[in-house]
From Swiss-Prot:
<keyword id="KW-0560">Oxidoreductase</keyword>
<keyword id="KW-0752">Steroid biosynthesis</keyword>
<feature type="transmembrane region" description="Helical">
    <location>
        <begin position="231"/>
        <end position="251"/>
    </location>
</feature>
<dbReference type="InterPro" id="IPR050307">
    <property type="entry name" value="Sterol_Desaturase_Related"/>
</dbReference>
<keyword id="KW-0753">Steroid metabolism</keyword>
<dbReference type="GO" id="GO:0005789">
    <property type="term" value="C:endoplasmic reticulum membrane"/>
</dbReference>
<keyword id="KW-0756">Sterol biosynthesis</keyword>
<dbReference type="GO" id="GO:0016020">
    <property type="term" value="C:membrane"/>
</dbReference>
<keyword id="KW-0325">Glycoprotein</keyword>
<comment type="function">
    <text>Delta(7)-sterol 5(6)-desaturase; part of the third module of ergosterol biosynthesis pathway that includes the late steps of the pathway. Erg3A is a minor delta(7)-sterol 5(6)-desaturase within the ergosterol pathway, erg3B being the major one. The third module or late pathway involves the ergosterol synthesis itself through consecutive reactions that mainly occur in the endoplasmic reticulum (ER) membrane. Firstly, the squalene synthase erg9 catalyzes the condensation of 2 farnesyl pyrophosphate moieties to form squalene, which is the precursor of all steroids.</text>
</comment>
<feature type="short sequence motif" description="Histidine box-2">
    <location>
        <begin position="201"/>
        <end position="205"/>
    </location>
</feature>
<feature type="short sequence motif" description="Histidine box-1">
    <location>
        <begin position="188"/>
        <end position="192"/>
    </location>
</feature>
<keyword id="KW-0444">Lipid biosynthesis</keyword>
<keyword id="KW-0443">Lipid metabolism</keyword>
<comment type="similarity">
    <text>Belongs to the sterol desaturase family.</text>
</comment>
<keyword id="KW-0812">Transmembrane</keyword>
<dbReference type="GO" id="GO:0016126">
    <property type="term" value="P:sterol biosynthetic process"/>
</dbReference>
Length: 352
């Protein structure tokens, strides 16, 4: 993520930090201790050297402006890096969320879903509100991983010449998917344990028939815990820098796609929107993120109903009643009483 941080610093960070924490402040009474601690005595993270510009990648060079040298917190200050990554993940996470979820809502999501008997009253505003509450906390918890990466603790590499062996730069993609799919399966399944389900994972299962805006509507610890494998991967396996940025974007888009209700992938391998709809409806199935492999091996795979893949039956009231009956039976076991407030048929007609 040093590429992203360099772009941020060049166009935003340098000016902001030079204005808020100008170099002249380093001579005041209160700042030297914090500055010195950040720049010279953090043995856990390694001592920081005076800032000298080095491009994050060989692909392009962003020559720093004068503002890069006018802050008491230079670019390589650990506190500045932490704050920058917190803001980057939070701000751009929200931007990507609204753009991708809105486009999916407009062009993909079937609006007649609001007529489903398990669609909640004011559901989409509640999904957005939950996301807005969770994003800053998830960003705060994610930032330490990114700081450790840019300070040299990860196995990120820049050019193909640096790959560990030939064709690894191609292999890294399926390896990333395989590793994170395995880890997220077990984390997600663990979140369904009765001891923690209601406090951590139930907020995401509030949405029985999710919209694209439910994609990031988690309890913050739930959303963060399922993202941990993505950030752990480059500390265990080599990963090309630009590939990491690409995968970071892909993950966010994929999360929206599996909540868009467009059941295109009737695949025995891909854990697409249909599989994930089965999970939201019936709780104890299809915990995987990308594939059905670990659900099959773990005995939790449930094949999506064939009716979901046919337009004439997907939104059929008889199919909805069948789904509702089974869902309510399972819900009593998982949650007990249902405290959700559903949209009435009259209200649903107004929303269409």
């Amino acid at each position: 993520m040093d590429i992203v941080l360099e772009i941020w610093d060049t166009f935003i960070g340098d000016r902001v930090y030079s204005a808020l924490l100008p170099l002249s402040l380093s001579s005041t009474v209160s700042l030297p201790g914090l500055t010195n601690a950040a720049n010279s005595s953090l043995s856990l993270f390694g001592a920081s050297k005076p800032f000298v510009y080095e491009p994050a990648t060989q692909l392009f060079r962003l020559e720093p402006s004068k503002y890069a040298y006018l802050s008491a917190w230079p670019r390589n200050n650990i506190y500045r890096q932490f704050l920058s990554f917190f803001l980057i993940v939070w701000i751009f996470g929200i931007i990507v969320y609204f753009i991708s979820a809105t486009l999916s809502y407009i062009f993909i999501w079937d609006k007649t879903t609001v007529k489903h008997p398990k669609f909640l009253k004011n559901q989409i505003p509640m999904e957005i509100a939950q996301t807005m509450r969770s994003m800053p906390v998830m960003s705060l918890l994610t930032a330490p991983f990114l700081v450790a990466e840019v300070r040299g603790y990860a196995k990120l590499y820049d050019s193909v010449d640096e790959e560990p062996f030939p064709y690894y730069s191609i292999l890294q993609f399926p390896l990333f998917i395989a590793f994170t799919d395995f880890c997220i399966y077990w984390i997600h399944r663990g979140l369904h344990h009765p001891l923690i389900y209601k406090s951590l994972h139930k907020p995401h299962h509030k949405w029985i028939m999710p919209s694209p805006f439910a994609s990031h509507a988690f309890h913050p610890l739930d959303g963060w815990s399922q993202s941990v494998p993505y950030h752990v991967f480059p500390f265990i396996f080599p990963l090309q820098k630009l590939a990491y940025v690409f995968l970071f974007g892909f993950i966010n888009l994929w999360t929206v796609m599996i909540h868009d209700g467009e059941y295109v992938a009737n695949s025995p391998i891909i854990n697409g929107a249909a599989c994930h709809t089965m999970h939201h409806l019936y709780f104890n199935y299809n915990y995987g993120q990308f594939t059905t492999l670990w659900d099959r091996l773990g005995g939790s795979y449930r094949k999506p109903n064939e009716e979901l893949f046919r337009r004439e039956t997907k939104m059929d009231e008889a199919e909805w009643k069948r789904q509702t009956k089974e869902m309510e039976t399972i819900l009593k076991t998982v949650e007990g009483e249902d405290d959700r407030k559903y949209l009435s048929q009259e209200e649903a007609k107004k929303d269409l």
